[in-house]
């Protein structure tokens, strides 16, 4: 179901013809003129609320690409000008061809105004080669009001990875952005000390249907991050994990006021020294089952940290409170139909021990099934096949649909998008730590 909203995107499929660049240029010219609008509440984009940079900061206006005579205009401008603010034209498209590394400290944002969002999108080269990563970072980066589409503009192939942090202690921030389409992971850290912030944004469609262990929002790859912060955002349609700690110790984790919908993996914490997980909706998150009835797996899957020179497990403080975690009946029925799948219990024994010794506060969490006004349909054919085959793998059924969009075309059109509003009469509408609504604030206005 889809409903009218203030959110609007539009993209057009482009098929690259190696021997006919005039054809490609024509269509890329058309798409460059298409309008892209934001997925965030309207006030994010209004002129009166646009932040003007302080005097003295370098501001570089970058003209859009046409995909034929101009590509990589953004990264070329950064290499030429270094640290600064880079403004992208609203409605413009900025193509990334080949390997693109940002080594400077930059803010990349939409130009002043309330028009449609600029788009950053990969474009394969004349030989059809598509880089594995959209952007790699050796400097700090902030993105404000940008639409990222991880689908190749020429072939419609979906990228493996979108964003990689290559050096230590880097900061990556998304504010008011819409990010979609990748197979393995959206954000990956290849070094320690990273700080990743997602605020007032939408992230969706991260899935490798042949191997659904992939499809992650954040993946530490075992490199200890300083901060992971996801706030006021909507995340949906992932085969993998929201956060993959992968045995790395995060100093600070903040997951507050978000709406999560259709995520295959449960929430495993291995490890976090301080974590606040509160005021969220987890709708159909963690439908990948456990398989041992004698020792059921947990949704909140905490692991005990061993003491070391760097970390003392006695210092851990985790707060999981005022969240709504539920599974729709059509998924619940699969645990009965395919009894080799065991539905997850809320907490494991490690979590219970941490409650007993005061390191974990677990309170005021509810399980209330909500009816969203315009959420995408669950990909039940894919999910049911996953239940049916147990641990045999999904490669033979990788073509079953999982990715979603509003109208069968890439992106958003007709001022419509999926929405996640729910009745104000729901318990969730007053269940937050401040007695307000749970979930992303954009759906409660």
Task: Label the model's feature ranges.
Residues 2-19, 26-29, 33-61:
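Bacterial Sec-dependent N-terminal signal peptides
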Residues 435:
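Glycine-rich, aromatic-lined ligand/substrate-binding cores of catalytic
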Residues 1-3, 9-12, 17-20, 24, ...:
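Generic cytosolic/nucleocytoplasmic N-terminal low-complexity/intrinsically disordered segments
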Residues 7, 66-68:
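Compositionally biased, intrinsically disordered low-complexity regions
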Residues 27-30, 81, 412-415:
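Short, ordered beta-strand-loop transition motifs
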Residues 45-53, 75, 94-430, 441-445:
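Extracellular beta-rich repeat passengers
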Residues 70-73:
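Well-ordered alpha-helical segments embedded in enzymatic catalytic cores
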């Amino acid at each position: 179901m889809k409903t009218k909203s203030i959110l609007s995107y539009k993209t057009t499929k482009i098929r690259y013809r190696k021997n006919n660049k005039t054809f490609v240029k024509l269509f890329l010219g058309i798409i460059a003129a298409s309008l892209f609008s934001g997925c965030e509440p309207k006030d994010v984009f209004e002129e009166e609320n646009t932040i003007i940079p302080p005097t003295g900061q370098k501001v570089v206006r970058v003209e859009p690409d046409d995909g034929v005579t101009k590509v990589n205009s953004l990264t070329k401008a950064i290499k030429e000008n270094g640290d600064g603010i880079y403004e992208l034209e609203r409605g413009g498209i900025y193509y990334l061809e080949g390997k693109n590394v940002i080594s400077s400290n930059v803010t990349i944002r939409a130009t002043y105004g309330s028009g449609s969002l600029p788009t950053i999108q990969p474009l394969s080269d004349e030989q059809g080669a598509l880089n594995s990563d959209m952007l790699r970072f050796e400097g700090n980066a902030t993105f404000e009001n940008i639409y990222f589409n991880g689908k190749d503009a020429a072939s419609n192939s979906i990228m493996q990875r979108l964003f990689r942090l290559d050096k230590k202690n880097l900061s990556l921030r998304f504010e008011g952005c819409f990010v979609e389409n990748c197979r393995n992971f959206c954000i990956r850290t290849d070094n320690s000390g990273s700080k990743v912030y997602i605020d007032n944004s939408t992230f969706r469609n991260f899935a490798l249907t042949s191997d659904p262990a992939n499809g992650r929002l954040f993946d530490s790859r075992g490199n200890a991050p300083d901060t992971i912060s996801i706030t006021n955002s909507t995340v949906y349609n992932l085969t993998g994990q929201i956060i993959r700690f992968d045995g790395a110790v995060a100093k600070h984790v903040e997951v507050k006021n978000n709406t999560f919908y259709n995520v295959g993996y449960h929430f495993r914490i291995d490890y976090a020294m301080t974590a606040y997980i509160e005021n969220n909706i987890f709708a159909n998150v963690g439908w990948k089952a456990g398989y041992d009835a004698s020792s059921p797996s947990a949704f909140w899957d905490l692991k005990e940290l061993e003491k070391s020179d760097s970390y003392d497990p006695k210092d851990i403080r985790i707060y999981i409170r005022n969240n709504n975690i539920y599974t729709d009946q059509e998924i619940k029925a699969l645990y009965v139909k395919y009894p080799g799948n065991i539905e997850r219990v809320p907490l494991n024994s490690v979590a219970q021990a941490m409650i007993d010794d005061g390191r974990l506060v677990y309170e005021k969490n509810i399980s209330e099934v909500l009816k969203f006004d315009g959420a995408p349909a669950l990909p039940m054919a894919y999910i049911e096949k996953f239940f049916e085959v147990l641990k045999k793998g999904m490669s033979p059924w990788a073509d079953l649909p999982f990715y979603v969009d509003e109208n069968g075309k890439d992106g958003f059109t007709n001022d419509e998008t999926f929405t996640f509003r729910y009745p104000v009469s729901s318990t969730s509408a007053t269940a937050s730590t401040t007695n307000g609504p749970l979930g992303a604030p954009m759906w409660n206005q």
